[in-house]
Curated annotation (Swiss-Prot):
Cofactor(s), names only, from the UniProt record: Mg(2+)
UniProt KW Magnesium keyword: yes
Source organism: Acidiphilium cryptum (strain JF-5)
Classification via HAMAP family: NDP_kinase
Protein name listed in UniProt: Nucleoside diphosphate kinase
Active site per UniProt: 117
């Protein structure tokens, strides 16, 4: 297995309910290490840039509004096959379809307020990590 890094964002619905520690425990229990982490409040410009791939989608404005509605925790997770492992831990985007024991099955409120974001591939993970972190902020 290849050691990888992936980006995770604990979304405003989860930070509002003080779930950061419980979500981090799930990452660590699955063998992922948190090698960088910071709590921030995304600006509208940051959210629009980060989610720019969805700009033409009907849900874009709502997504930007939600992601700027409260603090988020951005973090870099590291481990064997980190991208796939994180996606498995998160569960399906729609929490009604998420497997029991996944973050979204356990904590998500709905398809938008689904508690976490995770990179979908190694190349996007590298781009997403660079969006939020300078190399010196990642301590492996």
């Amino acid at each position: 297995m290849a050691t990888e890094r992936t980006l995770s964002i604990i979304k405003p619905d989860a930070t509002r309910r003080n779930l950061t520690g419980r979500i981090n425990a799930k990452f660590e229990e699955a063998g992922l290490r948190i090698v960088a982490q910071k709590r921030i409040r995304l600006t509208k410009d940051q959210a629009e840039a980060f989610y720019g791939v969805h700009k033409e989608r009907p849900f874009f404005a709502g997504l930007v509004s939600f992601m700027t509605s409260g603090p988020v925790v951005v973090q870099v997770l590291e481990g064997d096959d980190a991208v796939a492992r994180n996606r498995a831990i998160m569960g399906a985007t729609d929490p009604r379809k998420a497997e029991a024991g996944t973050i979204r099955a356990e904590f998500a409120e709905d398809i938008e307020a689904n508690s976490v974001h995770g990179s979908d591939a190694a190349d996007t993970a590298a781009q997403e990590i660079a969006f939020f972190f300078a190399g010196v902020e990642i301590v492996g």
